[in-house]
């Protein structure tokens, strides 16, 4: 757990509790050399908190957990590549849209756990 994560957890928890959290978000942003965000509330504030989660934890394996927690699901758009100076879509790369309620967002309970504790019920098909 890093200090940046603690600020993000505090910002998100404050937002969920009473709609605040901007001060935690701005504290983190100032430590990263970014400008403070002013007069944000509601959906705009939550959007900024989500964006900061993506920036702060990029490549660290948090993204799917965050998307599930927020109920956002996962959306992958067709890949693009540069050809002759123009950005073109690759028809061999399919779009993907997985809602947060999809079973693929749930990790199956480990077999050792279900064998050791017969009271555990299978949580995945």
Language-model segments: residues:
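Acidic/polar-rich alpha-helix caps and helix-coil junctions
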Residues: 1-125
């Amino acid at each position: 757990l890093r200090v940046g994560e603690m600020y993000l957890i505090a910002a998100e928890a404050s937002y969920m509790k009473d709609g605040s959290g901007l001060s935690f978000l701005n504290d983190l942003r100032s430590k990263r050399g970014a400008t403070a965000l002013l007069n944000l509330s509601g959906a705009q504030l939550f959007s900024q908190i989500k964006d900061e989660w993506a920036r702060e934890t990029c490549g660290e394996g948090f993204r799917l957990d965050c998307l599930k927690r927020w109920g956002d699901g996962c959306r992958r758009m067709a890949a693009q590549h540069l050809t002759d100076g123009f950005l073109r879509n690759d028809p061999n790369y399919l779009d993907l849209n997985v809602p947060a309620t999809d079973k693929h967002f749930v990790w199956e309970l480990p077999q050792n756990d279900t064998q050791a504790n017969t009271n555990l019920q299978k949580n995945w098909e």
